Curated annotation (Swiss-Prot):
Residues 86-135 form a coiled coil. This is Homeobox-leucine zipper protein HOX9. Residues 1-26, 135-160 are annotated as: Disordered. The gene is HOX9. CDD domains: bZIP (cd14686), homeodomain (cd00086), START_ArGLABRA2_like (cd08875). GO terms for cellular component: nucleus. Residues 157-385 form the START domain. InterPro entries: HD (IPR001356), HD-Zip_III (IPR044830), Homeodomain-like_sf (IPR009057), MEKHLA (IPR013978), START-like_dom_sf (IPR023393), START_lipid-bd_dom (IPR002913). Its main location: nucleus. Pfam families: Homeodomain, MEKHLA, START. It is found in: Nucleus. Transmembrane segments: none annotated. It comes from Oryza sativa subsp. japonica.
Amino acid sequence: MAAAVAMRSGSGSDGGGGGYDKAGMDSGKYVRYTPEQVEALERVYAECPKPSSSRRQQLLRDCPILANIEPKQIKVWFQNRRCRDKQRKEASRLQAVNRKLTAMNKLLMEENERLQKQVSQLVHENAYMKQQLQNPSLGNDTSCESNVTTPQNPLRDASNPSGLLTIAEETLTEFLSKATGTAVDWVPMPGMKPGPDSFGIVAVSHGCRGVAARACGLVNLEPTKIVEILKDRPSWFRDCRSLEVFTMFPAGNGGTIELVYMQMYAPTTLVPARDFWTLRYTTTMEDGSLVVCERSLSGSGGGPSTASAQQFVRAEMLPSGYLVRPCEGGGSIVHIVDHLDLEAWSVPEVLRPLYESSRVVAQKMTTAALRHIRQIAQETSGEVVYALGRQPAVLRTFSQRLSRGFNDAISGFNDDGWSVMGGDGIEDVIIACNAKKVRNTSTSANAFVTPGGVICAKASMLLQSVPPAVLVRFLREHRSEWADYNFDAYSASSLKTSSCSLPGLRPMRFSGSQIIMPLAHTVENEEILEVVRLEGQALTHDDGLMSRDIHLLQLCTGIDEKSMGSCFQLVSAPIDELFPDDAPLISSGFRVIPLDMKTDGTPAGRTLDLASSLEVGSTAQPTGDASMDDCNLRSVLTIAFQFPYEMHLQDSVATMARQYVRSIVSSVQRVSMAISPSRSGLNAGQKIISGFPEAPTLARWICQSYQFHLGVELLRQADDAGEALLKMLWDYEDAILCCSFKEKPVFTFANEMGLNMLETSLVALQDLSLDKIFDEAGRKALYNEIPKLMEQGYVYLPGGVCLSGMGRHVSFEQAVAWKVLGEDNNVHCLAFCFVNWSFV
């Protein structure tokens, strides 16, 4: 009630609150505050909007000009002032929402108009096709074709400025027809819904040459600022290695024409990088809109002919660009179009989806650009506050440097100083060295003070049925499952000293404690920047039991449950605990890229516990179509780890790096098997391999045949049937393997210990044959026992050494082999049990 009275009394010209005078308390008359009184109250309000009773009493004592004001009136004035502030903020917020709704409504109306034009065009083409089918003799009538025709080869005019202006105008026309017209058949990208609080409108191409994506949305920045940001492509496009403007001249109409050479990183070690030679045209439209449009000047030739260009495949950019229109009351409507031909023919067939998917372009380029300018808009408005008092631009630079360092390691360009070293005969891990990555000046932030360089060990592998987001989250949250603390300590020590001692010279112990401290995240949590502290202790007598904590700067991409990204990453670099802005960074980590883009996200709540994730028939197991999608999901994993080295230790560090990455690959394979939706492949009703029985049936045959041939039970409760028996076999303490009963036996089934011993998954198991896991002596011993196996149905094999699928030696105490009989008593397959096995 007091606040309501204060609001009434606040209608005077004092601009603050109001109150009663002493004589008017009973009569109900109002009084006004003097300007001096209002000024004094405003000063206090600026310091403390809600003063306590004692603070108000102190105010009356300190300010004589308020002596005629009662404490109750002071309280009412502050209530009124807070209320007015709240109303003003709410009014401002509502005005901003109204402006946003108005702009969004305009955007949706334009989109609706474009769709109506597209429908009209499709109806016309449909009628024309019907007419053609009914009367094939009709001549070719081109009246229903698109008004936007394919331009001639731009090379015809590229030799002179006037010709370039003609190309620029053609590019502008084609770009606008894609951004706001019907030149491309756009379909909404799955998972993107328009609305006032949505990301924007995102669409991908359907049935056109190359791959294309379009996005439009509202951004609270001025058009000139947006254009400036978007033209600086390396600042927001993580795959952009460099962008160089070779020539720039005025277009004569207030615009500018630029000849641009751009290089892109390779997403994985299995494919070459791309580059572009383009014309970029910037101009202002009659309605005040700013346009930046771009297209390739040639598909393969043109541009700089440097030695570095030999590592690239020339890709083509079809008319693309940005249309930025100012909104009334501030802000802009942004249209972004990316249309590329990435020359998919030059990559292995299994990886071509990366270059043939418009959705990948939408996620990596188009929406990335829109997200970036929205992020900067929020930072500019003060909506984003980051930890440790860091400026947003500084943290954003750290993210860019981490990503760039990781991309440099994966691509390994010669002009950056990278050269491939000789291998050890097994080409599973690539070793490259870089002697240039040494700090010579104080400005080389990504270099180290070492008299040698940097060794990079990298590998790529295909994953089957492994959700990328779940894998990256597991690697982030369970570092001890794959990392070696000594190697982290080795890299971290290079930050503080000019020498690189090999791990083992200063033994360390990891306490197992990992503390993650968030620093920053993007608007939709697509990227998260954080500091990780690993707690460790030195174990040498000289150092005693000293604290040896290691700090890592870590960038996580796509780990959010709802993430629909095309790239999932975990990249980290050791950093000094003082965390200086110019800290040198040497990036290492993981990148998972889906090859089969799904329309839905990974099921939420997937457990990350290795033990529980191996429960057969677990309730966390997704069912139905989602499960089948996860089971069929393919992705490519790229691992790259970098280590500083001194020149005299180059070979030793290279060997160490190769072994370390191989151990990481093995760990990732083990983790992948555990978190895969089809992890055991042992769900009821699921076939292990085409033409083979269901898993519970095979488990029953294995146990029955073992008892039949050897006279003892393999499992204690072998009378159980179905999934209960299957689970006991899966959890059995020794490795059990089954191989086909053919001329060249291949493995068809293994329990958990069997998969661990072979360091493989059920999917990859079928690529291993029986003879590959034995050395020459082992194969000879096995072949000598084959007649006995065929005669009595089983045979004991002496202890020895076999090989895992990764080529590691595995010792076992004893092995037994027996024939597995089916329902018709015919030999279905051979089973092996390796007792007390371990890696050598």
